[in-house]
């Protein structure tokens, strides 16, 4: 392999420091920002966002300060079909997606990687907090970042062996505070920029408003049901609800009520008390295994069912292109559409998209 790399630059501090570190290692680098929005109003600049027009200028400034060529690649068509359309389709079908995983899978480590190869560059470099290592058998492993509070391995479980072999995460061995110190020492204008928090194409965290505006559809009101199927109120459209949600229900009850299930076919949302949200068996499809080629028999792992979830012990089995995890303890508000990611301590075994919960 050569020492030529493409640095995916979002305009944030992490990707900027990743670029600096790669230059320090002697790599021949070019900086790239992916243009994701054909309609710039979708990616409008706002606090805690990424990939807006302002972010392009920040990334360009950092690349210039590092004496590094910089380009903007237009991936807006692919972003629309593989991220936004999938996001909307999921909510319309009562599923809660993770668009960051789709963006990594279809853009950063697929489309951008393909473009890097066309440019005769062997590596894609990002500012993710994770690590890639090679085991004694020549298999590439995805590992958690040393800074567990910033670890992003959950949203990277979809990387293949080929992609991992051409990926570098320079920040995997450091803490966020160290990254900011480097950015300040280099005079980067984004050194104190806040971390991105929300979905990049959703303003003010209102994903339902985004879906209505983007599609031009009106999603009709329907019935709230209790767990016995009795009507207990009216909801404002199924796209506004996800499993475990409490806010915005507008229902009075002796105890707090939460969303237990969303059924777009009947246009109903089932509510339950907190103790009705727990489940122990989680099945996932569209799987990708990293540390092993397949799971034979039963495997003891720690597993996560959402990004901000602490891994919990489970026994996992594989059946063709699906995996099933049986948790030692029931887990709260497990949601179809999110990822089930398996860990062998700090190593990602693999994962998949949750398709069934019991």
Ranges and model annotations:
Residues 1-157, 168, 177-178, 184:
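ATP-dependent adenylation/nucleotidyltransferase module used to activate substrates
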Residues 127-133, 139-358:
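AMP-forming adenylation/ATP pyrophosphatase catalytic core
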